[in-house]
Amino acid sequence: MSYTVHELFLTAQGEGANLGRTAVFIRFAGCNLWSGREEDRADAVCRFCDTEFRGGEKYGLEALVAAAVALWPIGASDRFCVLTGGEPLLQVDAPLLDALHAAGFTVAIETNGTQPLPGPVDWVCVSPKAGAPLALARADELKLVYPQAGIDPAEFRAFPALHRWLSPMDGPALAGNTAAAAAYCLGHPEWRLNIQAHKAWGIR
């Protein structure tokens, strides 16, 4: 099996319950909800996507795990890896999960939730999109871009998740969207406001 990886880097997690935690990010190329091409954005399920995930480098299993290990500080413990995209579950398979675990990584995944998990993942963050049925029945984190046409946070009242986050939709209306998300959280305390702190920190 080979994997197409758009980028692989060491950073601090900028969102959610693992905010500030050092992590190796593996961003897989490709998504099932948008091609990533601007000319196709109007037809995308999530037209608001702000992530570049087209193209990348091919890795074999051993090479990808070795690249992740090489990024981790020498001699440091608590290895943490975030698999993201695009949609990582289009490529992530059981052998990769097993190999990352064998290398000592706690493995987290950021997914739109439309694809099943191929094996044990230590931390699952699901970010549902309007019109995209979920294949996952639970998550550690539920992260919803807000406001999002065609989807209401109340729809996920019964969805099992340890943490529920509202992420203000980025773009020209960010200030207003942040105010709207904050107001919703104040009225529905089961939701927490999620801000992309890595952008404020000036890191990837």
Describe the predicted segments one by one.
Residues 77-79, 89-204:
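Conserved AdoMet/S-adenosylmethionine-binding subsite of the radical SAM
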Residues 3-6, 10, 22, 33-121:
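Conserved Radical SAM active-site core
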Residues 17-19:
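A short catalytic or substrate-binding loop motif that flags glycine-/basic-rich loops and adjacent residues
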